């Protein structure tokens, strides 16, 4: 299975904030720019106009434009960014240092109150990927899957695709893909 996944456009006014599943606004021009990139990519690669989206606005709004251009959009909550629970939407500076230290030192298993751990994110990503592979049913020539996703989800999928272990400490977490950039993952 081939997965082409674009990171959503950069949200507005989020500098210094912990943003996971907080629904934040994105400039309409940036949403349109990503929709244009995806449409051009699909045309050049001669792919079906089918794309998967997270229910968060920074992904979903791209799908709104693409659906007006003939794309079939499928929304899946499993594609959402990591859930930071009570941290979500707060300034990083306002989150207790001890909690952040605990998270950084037990990166795979620590979950903020009412949030999810990195292990839980990985489980969610792997379940979604396995469902897509199952749907393909072992076809020799499967149709690539297109997604507009989030940095944490993309990093988790990359780590899964390369059969690496889940990072145990924050320093092992890879650098995030740039906004509007796509990654190709092979499973």
Where are these regions (language model features)?
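Active-site-proximal alpha-helix that buttresses catalytic centers in soluble enzyme cores
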Residues: 6-71
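Domain-level recognition of soluble alpha/beta enzyme cores
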Residues: 162-187
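Short, hydrophobic/glycine-enriched beta-strand segments
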Residues: 1-8, 147-148
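Short, active-site-adjacent cap segments at secondary-structure transitions
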Residues: 12, 59-60, 81, 153-155
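Short glycine-rich phosphate-binding loop at a beta-alpha junction
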Residues: 47-55, 139, 144-148
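GST superfamily/GST-like fold recognition
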Residues: 151-155, 181-183
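Alpha-helical structural signal in soluble globular domains
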Residues: 65-69, 156, 160-164
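Phosphate-handling substructures
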Residues: 67-124
């Amino acid at each position: 299975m081939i997965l082409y996944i674009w990171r959503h456009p950069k949200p507005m006014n989020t500098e210094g904030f912990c943003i996971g599943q907080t629904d934040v606004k994105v400039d309409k021009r940036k949403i349109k720019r990503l929709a244009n990139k995806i449409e051009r990519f699909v045309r050049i690669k001669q792919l079906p106009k089918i794309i998967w989206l997270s229910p968060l606005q920074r992904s979903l709004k791209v799908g709104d434009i693409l659906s007006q251009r003939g794309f079939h959009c499928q929304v899946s909550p499993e594609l959402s960014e990591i859930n930071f629970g009570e941290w979500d939407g707060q300034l990083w500076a306002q989150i207790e240092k001890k909690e952040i230290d605990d998270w950084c030192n037990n990166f795979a298993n620590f979950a903020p109150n009412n949030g999810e751990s990195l292990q839980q994110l990985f489980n969610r990503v792997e379940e979604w990927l396995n469902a897509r592979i199952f749907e393909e049913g072992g076809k020799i020539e499967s149709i690539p899957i297109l997604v507009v996703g989030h940095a944490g989800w993309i990093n988790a999928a990359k780590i899964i695709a390369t059969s690496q272990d889940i990072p145990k400490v924050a320093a092992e977490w890879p650098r995030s893909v740039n906004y509007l950039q796509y990654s190709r993952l092979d499973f």
